[in-house]
Amino acid sequence: MATFKDACYQYKKLNKLNNAVLKLGANDVWRPSTLTKCKGWCLDCCQYTDLTYCQGCLIYHVCEWCSQYSRCFLDDNPHLLRMRTFRNEITKDDLENLINMYNTLFPINQKIVHKFANIIKQHKCRNEYLTQRYNHFLMPITLQSLSIELDGDIYYIFGYYDDMHKINQTPFSFTNLISKYDILLLDSINFDRMAFLPLTLQQEYALRYFSKSRFITEKRKCIKISHFSDNILDNLHDPNFTLQVIRNCSNMSVEWNEACNLIRNINDYFDILKSSRTEFYDISPRCRMFTQYKLKIASKLIKPNYVASNHNSLATEVHNCKWCSINNNSIVWDDFRIKNVYNDIFNFIRALVKSNLYVGHCSSEEKIYESVKDVLNVCKENEWNILVTEMFNQLEPIKLNDNNYILLNYEINWNVMNVLINSIGKVPKILTLSDVILILRIIIYDWFDIRFMRNTPMTTFTVNKLKQLYEKDRPAEHDSGVSDVE
């Protein structure tokens, strides 16, 4: 049983504030939702279950029941998930405010314990204190959180997450922030709450508290493309494709870590809720993560023998050649930018091979083929530099005055020629390693300039950042006909 979900269900009946704040999709009537994919903890109701993707950030972090409310930890609306979400540097005062919010929403005192006990004992078989019937009382106040890093910003989603030992397929990792607070003070707060419970429940409460307040923080995970909705991958090769996200917004205007203070003034809180609205954003999928995904797919289709060939056709337009014809049916070629990069890269490398090595036909076996296979994987800069260096050395460079040089005296296409003129100022006949690296980078950067890309897509922006971009007409820029530089 999910303790946090049960606590929200029972405490929602206490008063008007709780009824508004503690409303969860997991406790309401189920509605059809998208298919679930991975195992993990729903950030909204904190239960461990099968997760589907959030409509606000497209990351898998919400269960099929809670997905009906489309809540995201990046929203600009004072729902419970947003008020439990803290960002970057967290102070002791911030944690104090969080604990006060917990005490306000989930109080334990003699009156409340007696009230719930009377309701539960109305049935003749419920005289004993069974944990499953009093589960809502067994949620201690801890500083347990799930954290995630999104392009330099670290988000902490506090809650009470059961079954921490289970498999976690999400990009969130368990973080214990008790070191930023006073351990003895937190113990005292929980012991005071526990004192109002019957003895049998006190023991279970204590066990849960110490297990969730003394655990070791996990190593933070790196977010991967598999953590995002599969719908993105299905359409990623369309240059006109945009990501559609839904955000819950309001007239809330507080510092990020102060959202939990809003319930202190109930009238002001309900005024903010009246301004709640849903906003839709169309966002470009342009980011380093998705670019690397597309380039990796293209890399798997590479036919390295083309660099030794005499074909007059571009690398993607060779037909009826056993060694050079690529699979043109792959969806990756729907993106004309990938095709342009592929053609220009291999036109340039072929010119280098023909200028420096004695090769006559694409059927020949050359050592340089191994280095060419991953030449598109520029997102991993260090590995890519090593790869290009190996390729350069296999071209049998001539050493003069501690520098190595190779020749360039074979024909190149107009696109590559323009790159050479723009980067070096002319079409050179002699190149160094740094020249080759520079030219290959420019060919790729002309369409996919990863130097200025975020690692994750803009779906992980806060609402304020999305609004700022919309004012500049930038978030939904289509990619057709323009490069990332433009």
From Swiss-Prot:
InterPro entries per the UniProt record, alphabetical: Rotavirus_NSP1
UniProt motif (IKBKB-like degron (ILD) motif) ranges: 479-483
Coiled coil, from the record: none
Entry GO MF terms: metal ion binding; RNA binding
Stretches for region Interaction with host IRF3: 317-486
Short sequence motif named pLxIS motif, residue ranges: 480-483
Spans annotated as RNA-binding: 1-81
Post-translational modification: The C-terminal region is phosphorylated by host CKII/CSNK2A1. Phosphorylation of the DSGXS motif is essential for host NF-kappa-B inhibition.
A Gene Ontology cellular-component term: host cell cytoplasm
A single BP term in Gene Ontology: symbiont-mediated suppression of host cytoplasmic pattern recognition receptor signaling pathway via inhibition of IRF7 activity
First-listed, main subcellular location of the protein, grouped into a coarse class: host cell
Domain of life (superkingdom): Viruses
Cellular location(s): Host cytoplasm, Host cytoskeleton
Keywords for this protein: Host cytoplasm, Host cytoskeleton, Host-virus interaction, Inhibition of host innate immune response by virus, Inhibition of host IRF3 by virus, Inhibition of host IRF7 by virus, Inhibition of host NF-kappa-B by virus, Inhibition of host RLR pathway by virus, Interferon antiviral system evasion, Metal-binding, Phosphoprotein, RNA-binding, Viral immunoevasion
Residue numbers spanned by region Important for cytoskeleton localization: 82-176
Region of interest: Zinc-binding domain: 42-79
Similarity-based family: Belongs to the rotavirus NSP1 family.
Domain-level remarks: The integrity of the zinc-binding domain in NSP1 is important for degradation of host IRF3.
Reported function: Plays a role in the inhibition of host innate immunity by inducing the degradation of key host factors required to activate interferon production such as IRF3, IRF5 or IRF7. Associates with components of cullin RING ligases (CRLs) including CUL1 or CUL3, which are essential multisubunit ubiquitination complexes, to modulate their activities. Recognizes the host NF-kappa-B regulator BTRC through the presence of a DSGXS motif in the C-terminal substrate recognition domain.
The protein, known as: Non-structural protein 1
Biological source species: Rotavirus A (strain RVA/Human/Philippines/L26/1987/G12P1B[4]) (RV-A)
